[in-house]
């Protein structure tokens, strides 16, 4: 086992898993509480394309550089993580963005009860797209966690006794 390759792989895995987990469950909730709605939305709109690209591509990079045999466990966990990132990037992100734009447009056109009625439908749709996005983000994190467990086990088996 090449020490440089293994070290680089572990550092990359740590960066991806730690970054995804930290942003999802620490930084983003804090930003939501601290920033104004428009500021938070602008921040997320800038971050999420890169965030989901990282979620989609990094499991592929990990698979190509794995210092352990990619048996069913580690390979399937990386596939789950990558497919989750791809789903967020190519389906849920555009859907959520479209709904947010529709909400902005009706807010410019309507007021009062008419706005409330039209916005209620879009809020429900946003809730669906956002909820699914959270679910796929969680499945990415779980896939990466499962890969980390497999990686640890595989590396521990290679340590001379």
From Swiss-Prot:
GO cellular component entries: mitochondrial outer membrane; mitochondrion
Keywords in alphabetical order: Membrane, Mitochondrion, Mitochondrion outer membrane, Transmembrane, Transmembrane helix
Pfam families cross-referenced by the UniProt entry: DUF4149
Transmembrane segments: 10-30, 60-80, 131-151
Compartmental location: Mitochondrion outer membrane
Membrane topology: Multi-pass membrane protein
Superkingdom assignment: Eukaryota
PANTHER family: LATE EMBRYOGENESIS ABUNDANT PLANTS LEA-RELATED, LD23009P
Record's protein name: Uncharacterized mitochondrial outer membrane protein YPR098C
Natural source organism: Saccharomyces cerevisiae (strain ATCC 204508 / S288c)
Classification of source organism: Eukaryota, Fungi, Dikarya, Ascomycota, Saccharomycotina
């Amino acid at each position: 086992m090449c020490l440089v390759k293994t070290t680089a792989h572990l550092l990359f895995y740590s960066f991806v898993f730690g970054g995804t987990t930290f942003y999802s469950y620490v930084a983003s909730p804090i930003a939501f509480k601290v920033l104004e709605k428009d500021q938070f939305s602008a921040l997320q709109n800038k971050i999420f394309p890169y965030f989901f690209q990282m979620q989609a591509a990094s499991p592929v990079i990990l698979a190509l550089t794995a210092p352990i045999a990619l048996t069913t466990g580690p390979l399937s966990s990386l596939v789950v993580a990558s497919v989750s990132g791809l789903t967020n990037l190519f389906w849920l992100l555009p859907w959520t963005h479209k709904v947010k734009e529709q909400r902005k447009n009706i807010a410019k056109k309507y007021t009062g009860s008419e706005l409330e009625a039209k916005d209620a439908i879009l809020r429900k749709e946003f809730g669906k797209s956002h909820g699914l996005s959270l679910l796929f983000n969680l499945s990415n994190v779980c896939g990466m966690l499962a890969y980390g467990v497999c990686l640890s086990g595989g590396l521990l088996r290679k340590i001379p006794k």
